[in-house]
């Protein structure tokens, strides 16, 4: 695969290892992947023999054609593959050859990191954490639905099964699909911890092990692609839409967060505390609670996201924290020592994982900087509080719709700084357009309720 010329001498050890893997595993094509500002995975496919050129020169593309990137007069951009993200795509491999993927960073024509690249936004926030002496560990729990297709192959909202929480077959018809998803993920380097049927009919969860924040964001994007690909092979449709069916639980992406110092010690841990959390953990938590209204536009980025964030369906609405109370935005699991952490429960799996993690981490780091106070734990079901009781506890609510969430994002200097001017401007523009389209639409609920009444 290498040819001994000056370009090959510029390869890193990791890049050389990828070239060796490509040859050893009979890879014919490489998918070079990145995400647009909304989190949609984009890719360009190249013959495997172009891999060395991709590493040494990059692959050019038209940035003006990508949502949230650049204007046409600034359109020349380049993909730089990250060799540590190399993975064979099991569903694209056979005896005649196979395909693999590399996740890429985006640079401009001068070779500078593109400030509007979501992966770069997360890298910038993690660099700030590193300057403060921390690495960030994230463990996500993405949920998804499996739906039947109609005779024309289009997705429906007919659940693939009628199972419930932790059900077994025959109610859980998707156990074999989850099993194949797990095998595929493991073949791509994931460490799977558990899988099960979720509360709602047709709803599922597969948990993979926590990792550093950048790897976790890459893994979330990969996870969504794998779930969809395996579902297609079984002629069902997988969706990460937060609330595809009313009156049942929606899909979230609860995320467990902890910080580690340069010696690998969990700085969130304090075994003398009631919740096994340190002062640093409470400061970080305080920052997350303070900036939650602003980052909600990023962690819950669709009109549909706010159909999930309503009382009564195990999704958070109120900005508070608790030990075991799932009505709060933040829950502290019963864990100590190296496992000390807290869980933020609002994100949903439709988010751009790079921007969502960047926003939450930036909020927490600001809390450490400002010695933010999260207040006392709420030990009661907040869903049962009336407005006066919530006011007495000082409990605010998350934005009720996408429009309010975008306004909060645009009003928060910490989020503006973390995401960068380019991303904030382009993201807000796209989301305001989406919300305006939604407000102008007429739903089936409205026609069912009013068409014959008036």
UniProtKB/Swiss-Prot annotation:
The record marks 71 as: Important for inhibition by glutamine. Residues 25-111 form the GS beta-grasp domain. GO terms for biological process: glutamine biosynthetic process. GO terms for molecular function: ATP binding; glutamine synthetase activity; metal ion binding. The keyword Isomerase does not apply. InterPro entries: Gln_synt_N, Gln_synt_N_sf, Gln_synth/guanido_kin_cat_dom, Gln_synth_cat_dom, Gln_synth_gly_rich_site, Gln_synth_I, Gln_synth_N_conserv_site. Its EC number is 6.3.1.2. Oligomer of 12 subunits arranged in the form of two hexagons. In its feedback-inhibited form, interacts with TnrA in order to block its DNA-binding activity. Glutamine synthetase (GS) is an unusual multitasking protein that functions as an enzyme, a transcription coregulator, and a chaperone in ammonium assimilation and in the regulation of genes involved in nitrogen metabolism. It catalyzes the ATP-dependent biosynthesis of glutamine from glutamate and ammonia. Feedback-inhibited GlnA also interacts with and regulates the activity of the transcriptional regulator TnrA. During nitrogen limitation, TnrA is in its DNA-binding active state and turns on the transcription of genes required for nitrogen assimilation. This is Glutamine synthetase. It comes from Halobacterium salinarum (strain ATCC 700922 / JCM 11081 / NRC-1).
């Amino acid at each position: 695969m290498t040819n001994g010329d000056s370009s090959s001498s510029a390869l890193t050890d990791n890049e050389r290892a990828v070239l060796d893997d490509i040859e050893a595993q009979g890879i014919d094509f490489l998918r070079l992947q990145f995400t647009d500002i909304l989190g949609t995975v984009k890719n360009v496919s190249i013959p495997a023999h172009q891999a060395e050129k991709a590493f040494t020169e990059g692959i050019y593309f038209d940035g003006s054609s990508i949502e949230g990137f650049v204007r046409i007069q600034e359109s020349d951009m380049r993909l730089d593959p990250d060799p540590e993200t190399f993975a064979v795509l099991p569903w694209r491999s056979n005896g005649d050859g196979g395909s693999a993927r590399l996740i890429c960073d985006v640079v401009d024509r001068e070779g500078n990191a593109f400030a509007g690249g979501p992966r770069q936004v997360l890298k910038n926030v993690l660099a700030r954490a590193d300057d403060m002496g921390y690495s960030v560990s994230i463990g996500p729990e993405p949920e998804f639905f499996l739906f039947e297709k109609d005779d024309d192959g289009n997705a429906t909202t007919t659940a693939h099964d009628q199972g419930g929480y932790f059900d077994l077959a025959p109610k859980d018809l998707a156990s074999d699909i989850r099993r194949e998803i797990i095998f595929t993920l493991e073949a791509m380097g994931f460490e799977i911890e558990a899988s099960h049927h979720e509360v709602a009919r047709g709803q599922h969860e597969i948990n993979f092990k926590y990792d550093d924040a950048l790897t976790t964001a890459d893994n979330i994007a990969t996870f969504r692609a794998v779930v969809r690909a395996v579902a297609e092979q079984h002629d069902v449709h997988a969706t990460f839409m937060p609330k595809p069916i009313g009156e049942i639980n929606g899909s979230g992406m609860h995320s467990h967060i902890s910080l580690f110092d340069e010696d690998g010690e969990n700085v969130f841990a304090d075994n003398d505390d009631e919740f096994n959390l340190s002062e640093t953990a409470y400061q970080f938590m305080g920052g997350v609670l303070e900036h939650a209204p602003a980052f909600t536009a990023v962690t819950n980025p669709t009109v549909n996201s706010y159909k999930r964030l309503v009382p009564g369906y195990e999704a958070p609405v109120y900005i508070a924290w608790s030990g075991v109370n799932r009505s709060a935005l933040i829950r502290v699991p019963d864990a100590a020592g190296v496992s000390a952490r807290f869980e933020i429960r609002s994100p949903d799996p439709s988010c751009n994982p790079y921007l969502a993690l960047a926003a939450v981490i930036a909020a927490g780091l600001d809390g450490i900087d400002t010695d933010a106070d999260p207040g006392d734990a709420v030990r009661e079901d907040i869903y049962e509080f009336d407005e006066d009781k919530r006011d007495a506890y000082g409990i605010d609510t998350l934005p009720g719709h996408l429009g309010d969430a975008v306004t909060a994002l645009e009003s928060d200097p910490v989020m503006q700084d973390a995401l960068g001017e380019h991303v904030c401007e382009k993201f807000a523009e796209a989301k305001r357009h989406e919300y305006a389209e939604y407000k102008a639409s007429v739903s089936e609920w409205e026609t069912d309720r009013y068409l014959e009444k008036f």
